[in-house]
């Protein structure tokens, strides 16, 4: 029997289209940065092309990995993530005051990206188990350890993404109100404490509320991001015609690439990106629902968790760029420049494709019996 009709072609097609779009937009947005930092205005385009090819090859490999192996190796994955986070204190590369990358000569690794997958696997395994008395303590311990290590970098953005996905997961599976309220209270307390004890986070919050009050200081990024959107209007200025990317807007090819998309392709271009990302999200949630209907609890919860991670990160990135959320320094999934982020996001989508494939195969086998 041919299995080609079991592949989720729409999800795969949207992912490939976004990867191609990423190559174009990173190439356009990074011209000035590449010329200034590396004296080669195409340097980021070339590296992003390589990242995209590697990501596609990894997707093919991951798609052929049975889902049960992710559950089987969840402890190894989370342990590996914790070890990599620990090594950042000794071998991490500092950038803008944060140690988030490890230089392995041939590439830079961002351990916090691996945490997103390993934590999803661990959480999904926990939720799919019937006896949770001992595993609850282990889960809480891992959450606290990972939180401490992420804050030591500091990487507040990844922590917000993980906690947000955790709370939404608990809500989706119908956890009791008391447990959900307690988790929300703990998360809120941590966030407020971090803002209070870290002056630069408080300044970011103030600048987010009124960026024009200090447009040459903490509000600089947001002001120039807004100017990009204002200049783009409905249809944009055309690819390559952004002004803000020319040494005005910091990180135009990473954290603020949506601003350059808005300036060059307008609100229409932004709408297409938002629709594509939400398409991936709803596809993932539908895949998870079908897996749960087939009593594949780990697969279903994993699909939910992955989908939430992708859309929450997307909302935070776009929201901070348009001024409705504080700036967190997160990339736009698939689109932004960044090898680790692109690779891990593509691996997540490959896992979704595999879950969908296995669910369809199970239905066919059950029908034959």
UniProtKB/Swiss-Prot annotation:
Signal peptide: none annotated. It is a multi-pass membrane protein. Coiled coil: none annotated. GO terms for cellular component: cell division site; plasma membrane. Keywords: Cell cycle, Cell division, Cell inner membrane, Cell membrane, Cell shape, Cell wall biogenesis/degradation, Glycosyltransferase, Membrane, Peptidoglycan synthesis, Transferase, Transmembrane, Transmembrane helix. The keyword Protein biosynthesis does not apply. It catalyses: [GlcNAc-(1->4)-Mur2Ac(oyl-L-Ala-gamma-D-Glu-L-Lys-D-Ala-D-Ala)](n)-di-trans,octa-cis-undecaprenyl diphosphate + beta-D-GlcNAc-(1->4)-Mur2Ac(oyl-L-Ala-gamma-D-Glu-L-Lys-D-Ala-D-Ala)-di-trans,octa-cis-undecaprenyl diphosphate = [GlcNAc-(1->4)-Mur2Ac(oyl-L-Ala-gamma-D-Glu-L-Lys-D-Ala-D-Ala)](n+1)-di-trans,octa-cis-undecaprenyl diphosphate + di-trans,octa-cis-undecaprenyl diphosphate + H(+). The keyword Disulfide bond does not apply. InterPro entries: FtsW, FtsW/RodA. The chain crosses the membrane at residues 11-31, 48-68, 77-97, 134-151, 154-174, 177-197, 265-285, 306-326. Its main location: membrane. It is found in: Cell inner membrane. Its EC number is 2.4.99.28. GO terms for molecular function: lipid-linked peptidoglycan transporter activity; peptidoglycan glycosyltransferase activity. One of its GO terms (biological process) is peptidoglycan biosynthetic process. Pathway: Cell wall biogenesis; peptidoglycan biosynthesis. It is an enzyme of class 2 (transferase). Belongs to the SEDS family. FtsW subfamily. NCBIfam families: ftsW. Peptidoglycan polymerase that is essential for cell division. This is Probable peptidoglycan glycosyltransferase FtsW. It comes from Riesia pediculicola (strain USDA). The gene is ftsW.
